[in-house]
Structure formats: C-alpha cells, structure tokens
Amino acid sequence: MAALRALLPRACNSLLSPVRCPEFRRFASGANFQYIITEKKGKNSSVGLIQLNRPKALNALCNGLIEELNQALETFEEDPAVGAIVLTGGEKAFAAGADIKEMQNRTFQDCYSGKFLSHWDHITRIKKPVIAAVNGYALGGGCELAMMCDIIYAGEKAQFGQPEILLGTIPGAGGTQRLTRAVGKSLAMEMVLTGDRISAQDAKQAGLVSKIFPVETLVEEAIQCAEKIANNSKIIVAMAKESVNAAFEMTLTEGNKLEKKLFYSTFATDDRREGMSAFVEKRKANFKDH
C-alpha cells in the first residue's frame, strides 16, 4: 500500500525521492488523462487497455491516479463493445506503491473520518473481467492493485511484495487478506512480516499469477486473453466471474448454492440458448449479450 521506491535494492544506486501527485482534477468522458493512458485493443476493439503512466515515480499510486483509473474503468464498463479490460504499467514497474508524501502527515482522525483508501478497491466492483499485466515491481499498493484484478499475468522479471512493515505500517488496501487467500498463510505471513519480495516464478508456483511471459510480449499476451474472453457472452462472463469470486467469501455449501442459482439464471438468457444451439448445429455461436 505504501510507496516503496525507497525500499528497492541498493543496487539501484540512487534512491528516488517520492514524487507528490498534484491535486487531482476530474475529467469529462473522452478527455485526456494526466496519469494513465487508455485505448481500445483487439481486432474488434473489444479490449479496454489502461496503462499507469507515472514512469518517473515508478507509477506510485497517488490519489489523482486512482481517481483517473476508476473513471477509465467505469468508461470501459459502460462501453458495450468492450468485453474485458487489461491493466498494466511500464516495463520497470507495474506500480511501486502509494505516494508516501501524500500520506506521511496523515493522522488517525484523517484516515478514519475520511475513509482513506476506501476508493482504491473500485476495480473489484467492475463486472467485466480485468487482467493485470505486471512487469517489474508490484509492491505495496501495486501488489494490492494487481490482486484486485481477476487474472494476473507476469513478466519474467516481475517482483511482488508487501513491504509496508519496513515503513512502520501494514498493508491497508487488502494486502493481508488477498495475499493470504492467494498464496496461503505461511508465505503471506513471511512476506508481510519481513517485507521480502518474491519473483514471478515464485508467484506462479504459489498461485498468485497464472502465467509468465517475456517482458516484451506480456501486454500483448494479456490482450489476447482478454480478447478471447470478450468473444463470449458478456452477461454469462459476468455470472461466471461472480461465482468464482464468491468462492473466497462463502462456505462451500453457500458457494454451491450461488453457483446453482447463477447456472439456472443462464437459462433465462438468449445467449445460453444460442450457445447450446450452435454446439448442436456444429457452428460458431453468435452471442448478443442478452
């Protein structure tokens, strides 16, 4: 959750001082952003691509960036042509954490009454699948942001960590909860209590990421996966995502009940009828998203 460039290896030679985000401003739909880059990708422009773009600050997650990210997510969520979203950063860093200067003078009262970081998890309320394409550092808030996504693809040199303990605090945007669910108690506890990072290879072995790709092809691979998802029925994809996510919130019995209800619900859709008819007739399904 915290900005962690000061915690990167001494081999980096110099420690970059945290860069303060200017006061954020709201953007009208379609306007240019200051901290992110957005575009549509894929043959049918069915993939929304969001790139964090504060390279000098290693994509430190300031308030303005999060506000822009949430707006971009909502824009793609409401776009009927977009079926999935890819979130990425740069080759050096996905995101090295939150902006320290933005939080170092906060008090308990500020955090509690202002619900500090409460808008960070907006991405978890997006119904369309979000794939994190992680190159370089995903530390603190950067790691938490990646874990809020539905799928994580990692570049070969990616590193994941929750080093907040080294700053005298703990993760505050879901790090202790999502990391533990993803990799298990022992590894999560070790990472959170020591601040140690894990490599992309270790992250895959632990179940944090699903696939690893060369740095230069990572984003394209994520886009291809998103495009494959976007070819399916959007309403059915949303149901499937809801059901899988429920596995982390419910007991097995409760989860199975929800899955059954959602399964039954697919029979109220035209896309379920089209999908099964296409299978029987040995043709490609033509989903209409209803």
Swiss-Prot record:
Transit peptide: 1-29
Highest taxon of source: Eukaryota
Pathway connected to this protein: Lipid metabolism; fatty acid beta-oxidation
Keyword Mitochondrion in record: yes
N6-succinyllysine found at: K101, K115, K204
Enzyme Commission designation: 4.2.1.17, 5.3.3.8
Site (Important for catalytic activity): E164
Signal peptide: none
Binding-site residues, substrate: A98, D99, I100, K101, G141
GO CC aspect terms: mitochondrial matrix; mitochondrion
Protein function: Converts unsaturated trans-2-enoyl-CoA species ((2E)-enoyl-CoA) to the corresponding 3(S)-3-hydroxyacyl-CoA species through addition of a water molecule to the double bond. Catalyzes the hydration of medium- and short-chained fatty enoyl-CoA thioesters from 4 carbons long (C4) up to C16. Has high substrate specificity for crotonyl-CoA ((2E)-butenoyl-CoA) and moderate specificity for acryloyl-CoA, 3-methylcrotonyl-CoA (3-methyl-(2E)-butenoyl-CoA) and methacrylyl-CoA ((2E)-2-methylpropenoyl-CoA). Can bind tiglyl-CoA (2-methylcrotonoyl-CoA), but hydrates only a small amount of this substrate.
Entry-linked PANTHER family: ENOYL-COA HYDRATASE, MITOCHONDRIAL, ENOYL-COA HYDRATASE-RELATED
Identification of the protein by name: Enoyl-CoA hydratase, mitochondrial
Organism of derivation: Rattus norvegicus (Rat)
Native organism taxonomy: Eukaryota, Metazoa, Chordata, Craniata, Vertebrata
